């Protein structure tokens, strides 16, 4: 549409440059490291009658969309698992051209070889272009970034030019610098095509270049709350012109304790703005934030309304003890690294554990690198770049990287430490199986995590995953008060030490319990050669086991005494079956790893560049 197009360089001849007062460009920035961030910001008292008017409804329904019947719309929404709440929600667009984006935006879309809008884009674009407030709840990797960036470009093109001293028109708040940088990378390509300017404001990087961008004028500012409040307090930018506000991963920002900063920032923005809130979950804290910041909003949910994981992810849970994790991790990595696609993220709970595990794996020759919040921005950026380009295919991370980390070809996620909530679990495993791809998530679950066992089982059942019988046993133990102390995991502790080893099943009692839980015909959670979300034996019924697993191929393989299939959930070990098990798999279709009689020579150490201590 011609009304959307704009070939004007909005930053041309505005005369923005360095201040001519001498001294530091940064000026007297707040040096307080502790205290109350934003305490210098005064809540503005807005008088809408005195504010300049602005337009925010630019949506014109495409003729093809107008001819689509309500029944066709409902059929499409059901097929894409789109749930809509709110009044007067526009119809979803089924093709890019139906959104009526400017020609230069469509050119970028064509270069990126997108075939059709994702579900959240199809329903989100008409809502955002209509100027309505909205909440979008969708799983990771669903295309949320373009869902708000492309309508933002249309919104900006219909606003007056920025003048000297004006702040951004579009503000995107993100929880982490990694996510902010990724949004900036996406925005930069479209902004170049539309002759707009964008910048990324985050902590851990020099303030000078960021201030320089703001002084020159930017239409789009992607920022983390802390650094933005710092700049607002010292007067390096303002939000007087902001009419399009995006809260990306709002649930994560609340988890990280940013709610006070978010509220102080929103107080600086005119109340008749358009606000879009995006989240992967919909807890009561996010609902309250939406009620406070949004007006008559449209709620769009993609997928199940309850807490759910991506169904393209094969989830494997190993119930074990903390002392067994290292051995299990190494055996798992030996199989994963023999795969052609082996990019893996290992999540741990603490920064100390991240550093210790990284040092240990690198000492043993594994190409691993670590990332957590105490790393400098330069080092974090370098580590992520090495991981993205496959130079270090093993990334050991805390939850700082669990949200918004968008690496397309991550095939495996390992939860070395189980997170504190099922929401974090879903976000962690969501680093694999981006878009329509498949992936595998392994989780070490210990008795210390028993408070999360019910939620984890619910997530597994919703995604039609096989459930480890030991998880069900933990639920029973918890109900009978035997989950901790003398009664908890009684058999596991006795079996672990009675055989003198700490790995797998080492006693006849363990095998007996194992047979009872799965039936004597099945010694594994999944059928023959299950690979990355392809459920070759899907005959589990309502989470029950034993005779309900009726795959004839599996039964035959075990009756013949030559078992094949998958090495899943820690219920099998080389010591148990010995040479009778030719194939040991971890949810992958590959040749068995041949465990040598003596320790193999370590791999060549992966060199760390100078300047980064381990």
Curated annotation (Swiss-Prot):
Residues 1-39, 477-504 are annotated as: Disordered. ATP binds at residues 114-116, 121, 138-145. SMART domains: DEXDc (SM00487), HELICc (SM00490), P68HR (SM01414). The keyword Nucleus applies. GO terms for cellular component: cytoplasm; nuclear speck; nucleolus; nucleus; spliceosomal complex. This is Probable ATP-dependent RNA helicase DDX5. It comes from Macaca fascicularis. Keywords: Acetylation, ATP-binding, Biological rhythms, Cytoplasm, Helicase, Hydrolase, Isopeptide bond, Methylation, mRNA processing, mRNA splicing, Nucleotide-binding, Nucleus, Phosphoprotein, RNA-binding, Spliceosome, Transcription, Transcription regulation, Ubl conjugation. It is an enzyme of class 3 (hydrolase). A motif (Q motif) lies at residues 94-122. Belongs to the DEAD box helicase family. DDX5/DBP2 subfamily. The modification Phosphoserine is found at residues 24, 480, 520.
């Amino acid at each position: 549409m011609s009304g959307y197009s704009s070939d004007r360089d909005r930053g041309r001849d505005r005369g923005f440059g360095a201040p001519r007062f001498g001294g530091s460009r940064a000026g007297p920035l707040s040096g307080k490291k502790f205290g109350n961030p934003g305490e210098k910001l005064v809540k503005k008292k807005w008088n809408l009658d005195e504010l300049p008017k602005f337009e925010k409804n630019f949506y014109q329904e495409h003729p093809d969309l107008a001819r689509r019947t309500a029944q066709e719309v409902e059929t499409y929404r059901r097929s894409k698992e789109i749930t809509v709440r709110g009044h007067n929600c526009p119809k979803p667009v089924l093709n890019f051209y139906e959104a009526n984006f400017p020609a230069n935006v469509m050119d970028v879309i064509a270069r990126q070889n997108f075939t059709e809008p994702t579900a959240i884009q199809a329903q989100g674009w008409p809502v955002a272009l209509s100027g309505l407030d909205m909440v979008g709840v969708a799983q990771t990797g669903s295309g949320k970034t373009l869902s708000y960036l492309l309508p933002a470009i249309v919104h900006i093109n219909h606003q007056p030019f920025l003048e000297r001293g004006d702040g951004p028109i579009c503000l995107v708040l993100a929880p982490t610098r990694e996510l902010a940088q990724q949004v900036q990378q996406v925005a930069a390509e479209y902004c170049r095509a539309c002759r707009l300017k964008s910048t990324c404001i985050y902590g851990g990087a020099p303030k000078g270049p960021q201030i320089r961008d703001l002084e020159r004028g930017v239409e789009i500012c992607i920022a983390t709350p802390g650094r933005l409040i710092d700049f607002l307090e010292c007067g390096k930018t303002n939000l007087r012109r902001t009419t399009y506000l995006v809260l990306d991963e709002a649930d994560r920002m609340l988890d990280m304790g940013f709610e006070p900063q978010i509220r102080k920032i929103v107080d600086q923005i005119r109340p008749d703005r358009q606000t879009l809130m995006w989240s992967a979950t919909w807890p009561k804290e996010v609902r309250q934030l939406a009620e406070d910041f949004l007006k008559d909003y449209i709620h769009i949910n993609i997928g199940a309304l309850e807490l759910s994981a991506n169904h393209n992810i094969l989830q494997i849970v190993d119930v074990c003890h903390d002392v067994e994790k290292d051995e299990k991790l190494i055996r798992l990595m030996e199989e994963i690294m023999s795969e052609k696609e082996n990019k893996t993220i290992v999540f741990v709970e603490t920064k100390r554990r991240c550093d210790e595990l990284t040092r240990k794996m690198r000492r043993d020759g594994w190409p691993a690198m670590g990332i957590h919040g105490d790393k400098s921005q330069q080092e974090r950026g370098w580590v992520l770049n090495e991981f993205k380009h496959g130079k270090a295919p093993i990334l050991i991370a805390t939850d700082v990287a669990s949200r918004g980390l968008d690496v397309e070809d991550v095939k495996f996620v390992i939860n070395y430490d189980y997170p504190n909530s099922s929401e974090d679990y879903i976000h962690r495993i969501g680093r694999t199986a981006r878009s329509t791809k498949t992936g595998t998530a392994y989780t070490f679950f210990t008795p210390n995590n028993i408070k999360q066992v019910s939620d984890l089982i619910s997530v597994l059942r919703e995604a039609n995953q096989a459930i480890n019988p030991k998880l069900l046993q933990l639920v029973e133990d918890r109900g009978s008060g035997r989950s901790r102390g003398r009664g908890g995991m009684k058999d596991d502790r006795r079996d672990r030490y009675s055989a003198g080893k700490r790995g797998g099943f080492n006693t006849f009692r363990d095998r007996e319990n194992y047979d009872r839980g799965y039936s004597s015909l099945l010694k594994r959670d999944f059928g023959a050669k299950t690979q990355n979300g392809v459920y070759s034996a899907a005959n589990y019924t309502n989470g029950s086991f034993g005779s309900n697993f009726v795959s004839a191929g599996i039964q035959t393989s075990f009756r013949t005494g030559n078992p094949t299939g998958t090495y899943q959930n820690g219920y099998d070990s080389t010591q148990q079956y010995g040479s009778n098990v030719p194939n040991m798999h971890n949810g992958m279709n590959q040749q068995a790893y041949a465990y040598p009689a003596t320790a193999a020579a370590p791999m060549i150490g992966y060199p760390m560049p100078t300047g980064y201590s381990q």
